[in-house]
Curated annotation (Swiss-Prot):
Effect of residue 22 to A: 6.7-fold decrease in affinity to Kv11/ERG potassium channels
Outcome following mutation: residue 30 to A: 0.8-fold decrease in affinity to Kv11/ERG potassium channels
One GO MF term attached to the UniProt entry: ion channel inhibitor activity
Residues marked Crucial for Kv11/ERG channel binding (site): 41
Protein name per the record: Potassium channel toxin gamma-KTx 2.1
Tissue: Expressed by the venom gland.
Signal peptide (UniProt feature, chain positions): 1-21
Family, similarity comment: Belongs to the short scorpion toxin superfamily. Potassium channel inhibitor family. Gamma-KTx 2 subfamily.
Length: 57
């Protein structure tokens, strides 16, 4: 039972996709400023302001 749990947990963690975020060179101060940038560049409205720059995911 424990082996099944560990295997399931490992598969879940590996499927998260750590490299999904796409950094941009657009400066920001709030995450809402990244939504139009991400929409125009990548076609997705998911974004956040990280260290003063927009990251789209």
């Amino acid at each position: 039972m424990k082996i099944s749990f560990v295997l399931l947990l490992t598969l879940f963690i590996c499927s998260i996709g750590w490299s999904e975020a796409r950094p941009t060179d657009i400066k920001c101060s709030e995450s809402y400023q990244c939504f139009p940038v991400c929409k125009s560049r990548f076609g997705k409205t998911n974004g956040r302001c990280v260290n003063g720059f927009c990251d789209c995911f």
